[in-house]
């Protein structure tokens, strides 16, 4: 596998500007105004939360590694930069992305087992015929131009842990923040090292009183990031050595590094927006809207 992100297809072909992503999505809407009017869907971030929860269900019995689930989430995002979700069966796309990601992350699952697992959760949307998943896999690979290697922020977090002397609690929280960033557009907007640095800063600056984190950091961090603690922008802008030594050390490291601080701040703001809209999330609502869309358009056939 390509170890160097800087020469990767991810950097060359799968990083977008916010404007480009908005144009792509607006283009889908313009090309099929009727479908967009007939089948309204929740905010993309709420859909991402729903998709993530479905992937976790798929991976639970096989104890699939988090990195494979993260790769699957990136595949889904990439696929939907080329295809309007209203013309697809999202449950088949989720299942196929999971199957393909497991192969790429060297924890493969048998196709029949994956289909059986998916049918145990969504029998009305997944056909028993494994060839359907095979066809969708071909489409997924084709839409991504066979560019299947994904570089994740977890590696940078591991590399920076000893250098920044992060505590186990800080590492756990940063890991959870990285998990959460897959629920946003950030994997399509910024390099993985920027995401990792953002997660570390959030873990150190906004560290809540909880001592353990599992999966998502959202509930624990939402209030801290929105309402108080240390203001991140002030912390990053403080060149006078004020504030807690722990944070000043991090600010000093950032100043000496070549990390784009503006990008880190933008990533943090995106995370705050995610945690704010998370309060509106309803699994039932997402399931109902997607189910009506798939059934009405016969996308489950």
Curated annotation (Swiss-Prot):
Which residues does UniProt call coiled coil? none
Disulfide bond annotation, renumbered to this chain: none
Q: Is the keyword Transmembrane assigned to this protein?
A: no
State its location(s): Nucleus
The residues covered by the Cyclin N-terminal domain are: 53-142
- Assigned keywords, A-Z: Activator, Cyclin, Nucleus, Repressor, Transcription, Transcription regulation
Q: Name one GO molecular function term.
A: cyclin-dependent protein serine/threonine kinase regulator activity
Tell me, in one coarse class, where this protein mainly resides: nucleus
Taken from the UniProt entry, a GO cellular component term is: nucleus
Record-level GO BP terms: regulation of transcription by RNA polymerase II
Functional summary from the UniProt entry = Component of the srb8-11 complex. The srb8-11 complex is a regulatory module of the Mediator complex which is itself involved in regulation of basal and activated RNA polymerase II-dependent transcription. The srb8-11 complex may be involved in the transcriptional repression of a subset of genes regulated by Mediator. It may inhibit the association of the Mediator complex with RNA polymerase II to form the holoenzyme complex. The srb8-11 complex phosphorylates the C-terminal domain (CTD) of the largest subunit of RNA polymerase II.
For this chain, the family text in UniProt reads: Belongs to the cyclin family. Cyclin C subfamily.
State how it assembles: Component of the srb8-11 complex, a regulatory module of the Mediator complex.
The record's PANTHER family line, in alphabetical order, gives: CYCLIN
What name has this protein been given in UniProt?
RNA polymerase II holoenzyme cyclin-like subunit
What is the scientific name of the source organism?
A: Aspergillus terreus (strain NIH 2624 / FGSC A1156)
Q: Which gene encodes it?
A: ssn8
